[in-house]
């Protein structure tokens, strides 16, 4: 059921892509080693994906734990909200064929924001997303997390890259990511 794969450190996108490429299953749930999921999460998410073939992503309510414990207040999902911010965390469930369709996680997103870029690539066609109304994801907050270390210069670089790569998407939703990067995420 589980395989241990050892690869040279090439960033989270490279590791996820390698693992997903080798995965034999139909459904994917990326899970970082320090996070946790509820025991019913996979069952609930896969049930929804099976029942609705047009559904692309299933995620859930979440809470943060570690340096502080609290409910993670995620904005409601809409395609226009996705253009401004990421409200879907890394451990949402989707079909492997959709990962293949978009070419996986972008390995250029080494410094961060890879999940937001991935969800834009996957969902920019306006596809369906469903949120399970129970806490099934537990995100560990650490003092030295990569996202906390992301400085303004790196953020600008990532946002500029995304604004070019997904220009059609951001234009359609009237978002200039490169100018408003401090309001995003």
Label each region the model flagged.
Residues 1-6:
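Acidic donor-binding segment of Leloir-type glycosyltransferases
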Residues 7-23:
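Glycine-rich, basic loop-to-helix element that forms the pyrophosphate-binding segment
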Residues 24-25, 90-103:
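Conserved nucleotide-sugar donor-binding
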Residues 28:
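Short aromatic/hydrophobic "clamp" motif used to bind/position activated sugar donors
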Residues 32-36, 61:
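The conserved acidic donor/metal-binding loop of glycosyltransferases
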Residues 40-72:
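Conserved donor NDP-sugar-binding/catalytic core segment of glycosyltransferases
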Residues 71-82, 108-111, 127, 131-164:
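Nucleotide-sugar-dependent glycosyltransferase catalytic core
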Residues 111-118:
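Acidic donor-binding loop at a coil-to-helix junction in glycosyltransferase catalytic cores
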């Amino acid at each position: 059921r589980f395989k241990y794969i050892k690869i040279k450190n090439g960033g989270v996108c490279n590791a996820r892509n390698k693992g997903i490429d080798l995965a034999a299953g139909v459904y994917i749930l990326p899970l970082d080693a320090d996070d946790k999921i509820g025991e019913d999460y996979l069952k609930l998410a896969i049930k929804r994906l099976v029942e609705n073939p047009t559904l692309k992503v299933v995620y859930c309510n979440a809470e943060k734990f570690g340096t502080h414990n609290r409910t993670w207040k995620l904005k409601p999902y809409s395609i226009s909200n996705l253009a401004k911010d990421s409200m879907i965390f890394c451990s949402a469930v989707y079909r492997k064929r959709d990962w293949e369709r978009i070419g996986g996680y972008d390995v250029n997103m080494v410094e961060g924001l890879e999940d937001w870029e991935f969800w834009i690539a996957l969902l920019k066609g306006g596809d369906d997303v469903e949120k399970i109304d129970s806490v099934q994801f537990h995100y560990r907050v650490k003092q030295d997390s990569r996202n906390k270390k992301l400085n303004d210069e790196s953020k600008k670089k990532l946002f500029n890259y995304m604004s070019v790569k997904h220009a059609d998407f951001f234009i359609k939703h009237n978002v200039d990511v490169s100018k408003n990067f401090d309001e995003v995420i």
